[in-house]
Amino acid sequence: MANAEHLALLRAGASGWNAWRAWRDTTPDLSRASLRGVDLSGFDLSRTDLRGADLRGANLSGTNLSAAHLEGANLFKAVLDGADLAGAYLYGAQFLNCAQLVVTRNWQSAFRDEALACGASIPK
């Protein structure tokens, strides 16, 4: 379950969230959070626990999702253009497809299911 403090910081906006992330060495917990349709563009969500989060229709353009845990997250119609997926965990991500994946950065290094090979090898 998402940490209420982390969720409140996220809802306050990218500048406050990113400043908090710059000063805190923590793993934000947004697991199973309802973030449907939320504009998360430009957020630093690196190393964030987003397992099972509802990200349907969320704008994740330019978001840093490196090493984020997105296992089981619902990404139906999520916008991922330019998001950084270096080392992200995408196993079991729902409604994610190659068309969404290939417009991101560093997607080839993301840990993902065979269905999301998208012509590139999958890291072990």
Named regions from a protein language model:
Residues 4-8, 12-124:
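Tandem repeat scaffolds
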